[in-house]
């Protein structure tokens, strides 16, 4: 049985036993907060617990590295939707210690992609710079500052939205603000 099959079996039981009832809320975040964070598995539960957030408090948006690599990427789109459709007035950017995105390199990805059967021609496409798109960052504080700046200076984010950046310690959950 695959992991997805196990999840589907669990889900049937979850619904049948009404496990969802304790999670019922509406689509509007109670704290008018959005959090852009890394998709790292260590933060799956730790992030909300360390921030004191419960289901329904905030919109949580996750990607590799908690970054805004382009003003028109899906994370930025989600933040814009959160502001205009869901009433968000504050945004937290939360990166974390020992982030794998610090060490990402296109060279590594390219090698792995070729091993897994991706044609070399796909990696040479001229419509996207895969080297830039898959390159990580090397300074977490600088990355947080760049992400905060990208949000604050986005032409569709109003000036009355507060945006602040943080680094969470991956093991303890301790937050440090990045100024």
Identify the function of each model-found stretch.
Residues 48-53:
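Short Gly/aromatic-enriched secondary-structure transition segments
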